């Protein structure tokens, strides 16, 4: 398991892509690309827009409050445990499985926020990762070699436990 040390948490407050204050501003950019979502609200919004994400990762909460479950009837579900501030081997394996066999809904018992990094590394270049930035909007990240390098650099800050 990888754990994010407290001294590096502030680095993860910066968007890992372009921040859009309104979800509707993201939609015109999504046509023709594989979409990957991390977070309950952004997943619910993408489904409401009629888009089925290749991978959706949720934990049932938004800003630490219960969130109605995203309904992905066309996707198989993978259940994993992942504590806050960590990335477990179980989560990484589930993301790899989902990337190889989409669509998939990964339901996390615990916290899904840091799943952004292993998703970027697991999926092919050319897709879009979409996740919520609490209180600010939605972040859209183009998955490419630059994003993968940044994800590797950020993962290097984690401790193996």
UniProtKB/Swiss-Prot annotation:
One of its GO terms (biological process) is coenzyme A biosynthetic process. One of its GO terms (molecular function) is kinase activity. It is an enzyme of class 2 (transferase). Pathway: Cofactor biosynthesis; coenzyme A biosynthesis. Pfam families: DUF359. InterPro entries: GTP-dep_dephospho-CoA_kin. It catalyses: 3'-dephospho-CoA + GTP = GDP + CoA + H(+). Keywords: Coenzyme A biosynthesis, GTP-binding, Kinase, Nucleotide-binding, Transferase. Catalyzes the GTP-dependent phosphorylation of the 3'-hydroxyl group of dephosphocoenzyme A to form coenzyme A (CoA). This is GTP-dependent dephospho-CoA kinase.
